[in-house]
Amino acid sequence: MPTSAKALTKRLIEIPEMRRIQHLHFIGIGGSGMCGIAEVMNNQGYQVSGSDITESLVTKRLAQIGIDIAIGHDSKNIANADVIVVSSAIDRSNPEVKAALEARLPVVRRADMLGELMRYRHGIAIAGAHGKTTTTSLLTTMMAEGNLDPTYVIGGKLNASGKNAALGSSRFLIAEADESDASFLSLHPMAAIVTNIDQDHMETYGNSFDKLKAAYIQFLQNMPFYGLAVVCGDDPELYAMIDDIGRPVLTFGLEPFNDVQAVDLVTEGTKTHFTVLRRDHEPLRLTLNIPGVHNVYNALAAITMATDEGVDDAAITRALQKFEGVGRRFEQHASVEIDDGNVLLIDDYGHHPKEVDATIKAARQSFPERRLVMMFQPHRYSRTRDCFDDFVEVLSSVDELLLLDVYSAGESPIAGADTKALARSIRLRGAVEPTIVDKDNIAPVMQRLLKAGDMLITQGAGNVGQIAIDLAANNLYIK
């Protein structure tokens, strides 16, 4: 049988209802949520193409696996496509979207495409304000170690494989659920995790925390009545919502009332040792190779779900031993030599005050002897405005602070919510003297501030991570 015929047969067996669709085109394919779905569909035998405004490591990798990539948006890019998949950043003014609408092609959101993938599998969706990517990655690793071979779509790259998506051979699909634009309401999983809830992306919910909480309840009620909700019992807002979920619930946390509890936490460098207590199971002593109490919570969420899905303790133990973390989540790059010592480079994606605080605490815990120098890039003017006081408090706890301009993510500037305002308020607090840097003066500032024995953390969801890559590659900015 020809390869194309095999691919078609594979598609018809797995999703016969999608037999009319052969060619999918992704607009904004380089995005973290888009590239994973595109890769899964490509591996499933569909013809996949995509476009993005700029070339990146992601688009290069997708091209290497056979996906037709166009840089720039042009109506000709959608030729022969049967369906167009768009990220939340793409609107109807995009030339490819315009051409698709004129051709009466279906234009679907990324979450709707993920929802269709999930419809025909045992879907497990991971939602929450913080920790989604790490929790999804941990659960994927546990289920793979338990020989369940899941399909997965993750918002970051697994360091062990260098991938953020893969097509598995089993009925399981594990995926992140995005609350930022309420698109997680398009998913109908069999089981779901909510790591925590926080006031972020409030513009999506009319600046109403009650509407945000209602959306999470609706997300969990999208499961069948026999599904399972795994939620953090230590989060007071989540715990208060349990009675409204109307589905079976298991809680996890450090408090003794939880169904799954971690006790006896011991820190050893970047490792954390802890014991898991579960009903009807023997206590299980585990070692997590990534630092921070916040990651113990992420591990507990994954352990709770993995245990319910039948993963045994030996597989859970092996998974945690093998887990190498996720790209841009407290990712340690090679140290760079400076004077008579070195500077340790750490890169982290966290962009909310609670995430930044968790990074700082994990760094202090892991490397107490090193001075903490943070280069922070605020992400979105709206978040800077909404979390301004919390950012001031958290960022004041580092030893040296470098501030980049706000990464707008398409937003217009907001008065009093820019880097200068942030620096001014931090300076008035008096704990640390912030330095504003841009691409033209990074090198002299770094050369002046960094000392042997420091750790430099590049922090934020924008393009600040490239600085850590450049430093690790060639000591750029230091020498």
Curated annotation (Swiss-Prot):
Q: Which is an annotated GO molecular function term of this record?
A: ATP binding
Q: Where does it live in the cell?
A: Cytoplasm
According to the UniProt entry, what is the EC number of this protein? 6.3.2.8
- The answer to keyword Cell wall biogenesis/degradation applying to this record is yes
**Can the keyword ATP-binding be found in this entry's annotation?**
yes
Which InterPro entries does the record associate with it?
Mur-like_cat_sf (IPR036565), Mur_ligase_C (IPR004101), Mur_ligase_C_dom_sf (IPR036615), Mur_ligase_cen (IPR013221), Mur_ligase_N (IPR000713), MurCDEF_pg_biosynth (IPR050061), UDP-N-AcMur_Ala_ligase_MurC (IPR005758)
Its pathway is:
Cell wall biogenesis; peptidoglycan biosynthesis
Main localization is cytoplasm
Q: Which UniProt keywords apply?
A: ATP-binding, Cell cycle, Cell division, Cell shape, Cell wall biogenesis/degradation, Cytoplasm, Ligase, Nucleotide-binding, Peptidoglycan synthesis
Q: Which Pfam families match?
A: Mur_ligase (PF01225), Mur_ligase_C (PF02875), Mur_ligase_M (PF08245)
Provide the catalytic activity annotation.
UDP-N-acetyl-alpha-D-muramate + L-alanine + ATP = UDP-N-acetyl-alpha-D-muramoyl-L-alanine + ADP + phosphate + H(+)
Output a single Gene Ontology CC term carried by this record. Answer: cytoplasm
**Tell me, which GO biological process terms does this entry list?**
cell division; cell wall organization; peptidoglycan biosynthetic process; regulation of cell shape
According to its UniProt entry, the function of this protein is described as: Cell wall formation.
Write down the NCBIfam families for this protein, in alphabetical order: murC
- Which HAMAP family has this protein been placed in? MurC
Family per UniProt? Belongs to the MurCDEF family.
Q: What is this protein called in UniProt? A: UDP-N-acetylmuramate--L-alanine ligase
Q: Which organism is it from?
A: Psychrobacter cryohalolentis (strain ATCC BAA-1226 / DSM 17306 / VKM B-2378 / K5)
Q: Tell me the gene name.
A: murC
